[in-house]
Amino acid sequence: MGCNSSSEAKQSDKIDRTLYDEKKSQEREIKLLLLGSGDSGKSTIAKQMRYIHTKGFSNEEIATFVEIMHSNVLSSIQILIRNVPVEQLGSDLKDKANYYSSINPYELPLTPDIGLEIDRLWKNEAIQKLFSTNRAELNLPEVTAYCLDQVERISSETYTPTQEDVLRCRQRTTGMKETQFNVEDIKFRLIDVGGQKNERRKWMHYFEDVKSIIFCVALGDYDMNLVEDETINRMEDSLKLWNDIVNNPFFKNTSFVLFLNKNDIFREKIKKIPLVDYFPDYQGGYNYEKGIEYIRNKFFSSVPTATTIVAHVTTATDTENITIVFDAVRRNIIQSILKLHY
C-alpha cells in the first residue's frame, strides 16, 4: 500500500510539474491577431515576419508562388483588356485580346511565348492610358504594374520568385494562417485571417487568449470600393470594421496596434486624387501629412478611453520599415500586457 502511495505521489508531482511548465510556457507566448479588410496588406505583414524572424520560406514553399505570380499576371491583363474597346488595340492585337479576355487566369500556364504576347498587350497605348486613368474604378490589384512590367522574367522557364515577388504577389487569404517566431525568448503566434466580408464571421473562433490585435488599413484605399461589394467604399468599410472590433467587450483587456499601411501608395495618390471628394469634412488639401493625420484621427475617434493603442505608418512591402516598426510594436505589446495583467 505504501508503494502505491509513493507511486501516486510521484505521478501527482509529475502532473503538477507538467502543468507548471505549461503555464510558464504560456506566459512566454504572445498570441497576436492580424485583422483588417481584404487587400489591407495583412498577409504581407505575416510574410515579412517569416523573412525577418525565421529562415523565410523553404524551396518547396517558394515554388508555390510561381503559380500565384502567373495568375497575378494573367488576371491583371485580363481586367485591362476587358475594359478597353478592342478596336483601340489595333488589328494585330484584337484576336489576342479576345483570347486572353476569355481564359481562366488560374488554369492557363504562363509560357515564355504567352509572356511575350502579354507584354505587347501591356505596352499598348490604349491599355497604358486605361491603367493610368482608371485603376481605382477597375479595382486593379496593386501588383498589376509590378508583375506586368516584369512579365518576361516571370514567364521564363527558369523563373524562381524573389523575396520581393513573394511579398508583392496577391493571394486572397481564406480561413486562418498562423506564423510562429521567437524574439528574445518570447514565442509569438501571429494569426492572419481572411479580410473579405464573407470571411469575417469566422474571426470569433480565434479571439481566445489574444494579447494584442494588429489592425491594418490601406491608406490608399480612400477612393476605391470593395471587390466583393462595389457599393461600399473601402476606407469606410475599414472604419466600420475597426469600430466593431475596438469596441467589442471581448477585447477590453487587449491592446491594439493600428497599421496605417500602404503609405507609399497614399503619398503619391493624395497629390492627384482629392481626399475631400470621398471625405467631405477633410480640410487638408493635397497635403500628405495632413491626410495621414486626418485618417489617424478618424480611427482614433472611436477608441474607448481605457483602450491601449498605438499607431504606425507602414509600407508592408518594405522589409526595413517593418523590421523597425515591429521592434517598437513588440516592446509596446509587452509593456501593455504587463500593465493590463500584472
From Swiss-Prot:
It holds the Pfam family G-alpha. A lipid is attached at G2 (N-myristoyl glycine). Residues 188-197 are annotated as: G3 motif. InterPro entries: Gprotein_alpha_su (IPR001019), GproteinA_insert (IPR011025), P-loop_NTPase (IPR027417). GO terms for biological process: adenylate cyclase-inhibiting G protein-coupled receptor signaling pathway; adenylate cyclase-modulating G protein-coupled receptor signaling pathway; negative regulation of adenylate cyclase-activating G protein-coupled receptor signaling pathway; negative regulation of asexual reproduction; negative regulation of cell growth; negative regulation of cGMP-mediated signaling; negative regulation of developmental process; negative regulation of G protein-coupled receptor signaling pathway. A lipid is attached at C3 (S-palmitoyl cysteine). Transmembrane segments: none annotated. Residues 28-342 form the G-alpha domain. Keywords: GTP-binding, Lipoprotein, Magnesium, Metal-binding, Myristate, Nucleotide-binding, Palmitate, Transducer. Residues 165-173 are annotated as: G2 motif. GO terms for molecular function: G protein-coupled receptor binding; G-protein beta/gamma-subunit complex binding; GTP binding; GTPase activity; metal ion binding. GO terms for cellular component: cytoplasm; heterotrimeric G-protein complex; plasma membrane. Residues 314-319 are annotated as: G5 motif. Residues 31-44 are annotated as: G1 motif. GTP binds at residues 36-43, 167-173, 192-196, 261-264, 316. Mg(2+) binds at S43, T173. Residues 257-264 are annotated as: G4 motif. G proteins are composed of 3 units; alpha, beta and gamma. The alpha chain contains the guanine nucleotide binding site. Guanine nucleotide-binding proteins (G proteins) are involved as modulators or transducers in various transmembrane signaling systems. G alpha-9 antagonizes broad chemotactic response. It functions rapidly following receptor stimulation to negatively regulate PI3K/PTEN, adenylyl cyclase, and guanylyl cyclase pathways. Belongs to the G-alpha family. This is Guanine nucleotide-binding protein alpha-9 subunit. It comes from Dictyostelium discoideum. The lineage of its organism: Eukaryota, Amoebozoa, Evosea, Eumycetozoa, Dictyostelia.
